[in-house]
A protein has these predicted regions:
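Short Fe-S-cluster ligation motifs
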Residues: 134-150, 450-495
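Accessory C-terminal segments flanking Radical SAM cores
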Residues: 15, 21-44, 334-456
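Canonical Radical SAM [4Fe-4S] cluster-binding loop centered on the CxxxCxxC motif
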Residues: 90-128
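Cysteine-centered iron-sulfur cluster-binding motifs in ferredoxin-type domains/subunits
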Residues: 100-107, 153-156, 422-424, 428-429
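Radical SAM/AdoMet-radical enzyme domain recognition
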Residues: 130-150, 157-290, 304
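Cys/His-rich metal-chelating microdomains
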Residues: 103, 107, 111-114, 428-431, ...
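Radical SAM enzyme [4Fe-4S]-AdoMet core and its adjacent flexible, acidic
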Residues: 2, 217-232, 236, 240, ...
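N-terminal [4Fe-4S]-dependent radical SAM core
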Residues: 6-39, 58-97
Length: 496
């Protein structure tokens, strides 16, 4: 239900603040604009609509506590909480993804980045362009700046990585921003010398682990060796380096991402077990996206939203089993959504906000100076379509980038209130759309969300999480609350 009540009739509606509702099994889920929720039986919901729910009924008290009933004081509190949830709208882009090269030493069956061979050094960012990118990044009004190195394999162009880090640290002595660096790498070109530099500059390191060695190496081919063995070796070595600095291993370690392919679907437990074996306490189960090589190989490695959800829910069920046995492991997407559901805090995950982060939360810089709304927009460009290019350095100013047509168009297309399906959805307070994904899969930035794979997956994930919450198992609810806890990793912010 949307903010109007024309679809419901009942004298109780005039007592209520705007809300949305939808089925949750044989019950009804109600949500309000700041993400508070109540699960009711159909009979209880009918009584709420008719204004016949007794004031001392447990559900009445819950609705009152969660600001569903209208009053001036409640309206003011809701306005303040809404402003807090949406404070990201006024900060400017904080995530700056820098593609220092398209070259890569691995060949992935799903490569979204359209990688190039190691011999092709025409796709490296020059030191001069690296400095121009940094100059542009520091024009953002955001008090926080995260510079994320991607590729290709960013370690292939180590000089550009070093130049960007050193020049950013130098500029920040006067800019005074909360500066953070992140490196997304397959780790196969890591050396002790590079690691020492990254540690000295407090760079977060993230890699890919697609599950057990057999699955990982089938997805990610490394000439002359095992991509999994190399990644595992350096994960352990980097974790040791953090520990040698006296850092808490629960906070400071190599993060890992997983891309699900068809061969992954029948191994949810094995995938989770591999992350536990590697000492990881979080796993990010990511579906394929319609970008890069994944488009060409989809018939071999792809699947339906329903097949992915069967895998995903089996993996989450197993994680909950492990947690009950004392093994700490969480799933990142679930943790992000649970933070939105169970807390007053919004984690500002750029893919799940309204409007999305394209241009106004993140910007992507290609090796050649071309600038894009986001990394996904840059991926579309590598497929031969420049629809999401917002400028080119050094000729485009920061103002030019922010006022470009793609930034404006994606802000409109990702505002959920502007989407006929999303505006009525009970999950609207927790969700977000990706116009670039819509464009790649369905040919338009608004998309046809009824048949949209991404929408089906997020809707299914929220169905699962709310279903578990509604079961009322206190042990599971405790695990879910723990998944929402974010501890400060201040060591990664040493340049402010």
């Amino acid at each position: 239900m949307a903010l109007g009540f024309e679809r419901l009739k009942g004298k109780g509606l005039e007592l209520l603040n705007p809300f949305r509702y939808g089925p949750l099994g044989d019950r009804i889920l109600m949500t309000n604009e700041v993400g508070e929720f109540v699960v009711l039986s159909e009979e209880e919901f009918e009584k709420v609509v008719e204004g016949e729910l007794a004031w001392d009924h447990p559900r009445y008290l819950e609705l009152d506590e969660k600001h569903f009933f209208r009053s001036d004081a409640v309206t003011q509190e809701l306005a303040e909480r809404y402003a807090t949830k949406n404070r990201f709208l006024f900060s400017g882009p904080y995530l700056h993804i820098v593609i220092v090269t398209l070259r890569c030493n691995e060949v992935c069956v799903y490569c979204h980045a359209s990688r190039r061979d190691l011999a092709d050094n025409t796709v490296d960012m020059s030191p001069d362009m690296a400095r121009k990118v940094v100059d542009t990044i520091f024009e953002t009004p955001s008090p926080s700046v995260t510079i994320e190195f991607q590729g290709g394999e960013p370690l292939v162009n180590w000089p550009a990585v070093k130049e960007i880090i050193e020049y950013s640290v130098e500029k920040n002595r006067t800019a005074g921003k909360r500066l953070e660096f992140s490196l997304v790498s397959n780790l196969a070109m890591m050396t002790e010398e590079k690691l020492a530099f990254l540690m000295e500059n407090n760079v977060q390191i993230c890699t890919s682990i697609d599950g057990p060695k057999e699955i990982h190496d089938a997805n990610r081919h490394l000439k002359g060796g095992s991509a999994h063995e190399v990644a595992e070796f350096w994960m352990k070595r980097i974790d040791e380096a953090y520990a040698a600095r006296g850092l808490d291993p629960d906070l400071y370690h190599v993060e890992a991402l997983l891309t699900v392919t068809r061969r992954t679907l029948s191994h949810p437990r094995e995938v989770v077990d591999e992350y536990v074996r590697l000492g990881r306490k979080a796993i990010f189960l990511r579906p394929l996206n319609p970008f890069g090589f994944a488009v060409k190989t989809f018939k071999e490695i792809g699947y339906t939203a329903e097949e992915f959800m069967a895998f995903y829910t089996a993996a989450l069920d197993y994680m909950l089993e492990l947690n009950q046995k004392g093994v700490e492991i969480l799933e990142r997407t679930a943790a992000i959504l649970l933070t939105k559901i169970l807390t007053a805090y919004d984690p500002n995950y750029l893919d799940l906000r309204s409007p999305c982060g394209a241009g106004i939360g993140q910007v992507a810089y290609n090796f050649d100076g071309k600038v894009f709304t986001c990394d996904e927009g840059r991926m579309v460009y590598q497929m031969g379509d420049d629809a999401f290019q917002i400028g080119e350095l050094p000729s485009s100013s920061y103002t030019d980038l922010m006022l470009s047509s793609p930034v404006k168009a994606l802000a409109v297309a990702s505002t959920l209130e502007a989407n006929p399906l999303c505006v009525d959805c009970v999950y609207k307070p927790y969700c977000g759309v990706c116009p670039v994904y819509n464009y790649a899969e369905q040919g338009g930035i608004f998309g046809q969300l009824v048949s949209n794979t991404r929408c089906k997956i997020y809707h299914g994930t929220l169905d699962y999480l709310f279903g578990k919450i509604a079961e009322g198992n206190n042990e599971v609810l405790d695990f879910f609350r723990k998944w929402t806890i974010v501890r400060d990793r201040s060591m990664f912010f040493m340049h402010d």
